[in-house]
């Protein structure tokens, strides 16, 4: 199963055509077509009818495309029936609280892939943890299916469950995000998210701080609800040129040192040992993966001209 680099995910209500039609221009690594919270109950059926054609529209700019479904048992099968078609990269399961929910989701998706000629295991899962109950089960959930590629905290709903309002520094979800990182990293699942609110889309400075706090905890990307937030996420999760240059030199001098019999070398007054060397390799790998994503998006946009 190929897992591409994904820094930013732009969430769009699929029932608003003008948002979907412009999605490919927004620069996001992924577009998430929403059937859940952003779509009112009276619009659910109409939204489902729009998903199939919206997959191709949203993908025009080279982004991955997913659908956030409703967890409600009365709606989940209908949402999947409307969503699992060629061109779908992923399904986001909101308010997850058990491994069994993921396994049930997998059974339905497997069946639809077979029926619709989609290569097995094409559709990956993103898991949204939005309750303390879900957080307690996060470790089991993270290993419930090999399709799970990412997991993240939904800050607004999680705060609602805690009975608190989101704060400027996100202190009330600091532990939850840290725990998601802890359970995800050992099993190869990408931890995503914010330490702060997703809703303040006009205050980009505060949003950048929320993204940066999550990155510092070990998250690998974030979601957003407004196009202006996309560039912020991409910038925060892209290593700077200076950092990449230092990483490249660190790898070179360390490997030269090893050849000379030492595993600790000096680079511009900084020690480069095995952890620093390994971290430098991760930075270079991330930069290479981001370059591949940007190339894919640029080539897709060029074909539209």
Task: For every predicted segment, state its role.
Residues 1-305:
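Expand to "…catalyze enediolate/carbanion chemistry for C-C bond making/breaking, isomerization
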